Structures are given as C-alpha cells and as structure tokens.
Amino acid sequence: MTSDTLSPAVQRALADPALTHEERANLELVLRFRSVPFADRDKYTVDGFRPSRIGMATLAALNPDPGLRYDGRSIPDRTDRILDVIVHGDRVWATWLIEGTHLGHVYGIPPTGRAVSVLEVGQWRIENGLIAEAWFFVDELALIHQLGAWDGLASAPRGADDPGVNQ
C-alpha cells in the first residue's frame, strides 16, 4: 500500500501522529480488507464473520433470488473513493463514494450500462488483528434512482396504512 494511491482522507489519517500503534494497524487492516475482491476477504475476518448491511439489505429483501444479488459482476469497474475516515481504539469508520458502471444484476435490476455514484458509510470493529464486526449503510434510493428503477417503485400501489398515502 503506497500513500500516493490513497485518498487524501486516508493519507491524513495515516499521517495523524495521535494514532496509536493499534489504531494505525486497525486502519491498515481495513484498507487491506477493502482492497481485495469480496471472495478474498475471509483472511482478514474472524471465523463466521457476517457484516450487517442496511440499505442493500432492503433491496435484497425485495428480490431474494441469490442469482440476482449484488456481486463483483454487478459493477465490475467499481472504485471506492474514501471521503473521510476516523479511527478510535478498536473501531474504524469511513465514508466513501462507490463509482462504476452497472453491467450486472443488482438485486433483480437488470444491467443498464449506466454510470453510478453512490455514498456508503461503514464501521468495522477489530479484535485480535481481525475484523470481528462490520456495519454498512448505502444510499439505496440514490442507487435505484440512478439505475432507472425509481419510477416503478414510486408508482407502486400503496395501502391505506402506508404513511406516504396522505402526504
């Protein structure tokens, strides 16, 4: 990992003299974890690791077919630009922008070829040099809007108990 390939936010965090040795190691672990394909991330996590996702999880619930979920084929040219990062003790928080081209299924939304730019926030808890827990929130409404799927959702029939009906 070279600092010239890192975002200014990560460079600032790594250069922070107030970081402890543990905090610097935790940040470097998260950066290594994020730098490899999804299939190769297990070596950075505890056994049985399962991240908590909010945002994409809602889209997954709409279409539970495992063949139509999000994977490396969904946005194959995906890049993540870290906008901000905070490290404190055993926690690392980051905000990043996912950018790329929608060329594979995203939770049932067929490939559109459209460019996407979506904000995501993540938090990782480190234990004994491995990621023990992680939580992520992605702006799924921005994603479905950019993929052209918003019109179908916005015009879907609503029940009388839907709070948006009377607004």
Region spans (language model):
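C-terminal and inter-domain tail/linker signature
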Residues: M1-Q167
